[in-house]
Amino acid sequence: MRIGIFTRLGADSIMRFFCTREKKTLSNNLSPIGGPAVNTLIVGFLAKGHFVRVFTPATNDFYVKGDGVEVVGLKNNDNYLVKYTVGCFVDAFRMKRAIENKIHDLDVLHAHWSYEGAWAAGQYAHIKPVFCTIRDWAPLIWKFESAKNKITWSFRVLLNELVLRQKKVEFVANSPYTANLAKRKLKKEVPMIPNPISPSFLKSDSHVNPLIFTVLCISSSNDKRKNIPTLLKGFQFFFKKNNNARLQIIGEPFTLDNECCKAWEAQGLLKSVELLGLQKHDDLKCFLDNCSVFITPSLEETFGNTLIEAFARRVPVIGGEKSGAVPYVLGQGEFGYLCDVSDAQSVAAALYEVYSNPSESLLIAEKAYMNVETRYVSNRICDEHIELYNKAIGSYEN
């Protein structure tokens, strides 16, 4: 099958399919990580012999061709005022024009996230099947954002609304939580296909806890929804009673020169905390293998890809009991520990639960690993997508 994917592509994930010159173009114009779940899906399609053409935001316009895959980079508007106001609309219209002559040889178009790529792809839903996987819920994100960021997100909420009104686009949810939100909005059932994980992420041997009780958090941002300050406070409560412990936080904002991090340090919230900044996605395996527990303090997630990555490395996991799709991924507590992540004392209590019951926590982690192995491995998730595509193609042909 010939598949068009709209996503923010991570360069590192597909380097193996390109020659040296093309690799340089990719590394110069794309972020190294992008969206790991969609990266994994793309690689899974390629492994099964499908052709994939990826349309992605980039530093500059470019086109590269590799082994069974092509990447079309589309430069975003970088004017400051435009970028943080109507930029999403400008980019959507530009993408629509740019892809016009690059989609006719494709069997299906699939946009991930319901913004620029989804709107652009949706303009061609009258000639071929177009799918959109809803990977966040824009109105809810708007509520969490600061007053300044609400300006930007007001435009994104409007664009998301226009995408969801496209009658010919077939929507997909990445969790029952997202599917329920979409059902209420669209007044119809929406199929659910969860995020995939690469088989290479699965750890074959058992997890061994480090000598120092190590708490690991991976977060792509430092906004209110990600709730990092509550984690820091909860860890400090835990650390006062169990000083053989450390907290490691991975993600681009988490460096000592970041203004928020400086403020946390001044408040005494960084005692025994290591800010590790952005790390290569493949290197996360090493950090997971050397931690005692993984925690996501997010107040809301439509899935939470880092949760299944921790499962895949056989690591105990803590997440929020009311945090969107997190309880679903954690099997309502069967595959991990649920707590009130909005309360620092509850976070500390969950950390203590794992700390004081290492054997039990590793048994729960083993159950989580088995669940990942049977439900989330990319081979299965790719097949579920292809089945969905084939049904849509058949209806268009008929």
Provide a role label for each language-model segment.
Residues H207-K226, L232-Q236, Q248:
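Conserved donor-binding/catalytic core segment of Leloir-type glycosyltransferases
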Residues C260-Q279:
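Nucleotide-activated donor-binding/catalytic signature segment of Leloir-type glycosyltransferases, i.e.
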Residues L299:
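Aromatic "clamp/platform" in nucleotide-sugar-dependent glycosyltransferases that forms part
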Residues P316-G320:
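Short hydrophobic beta-strand element within catalytic cores of glycosyltransferases
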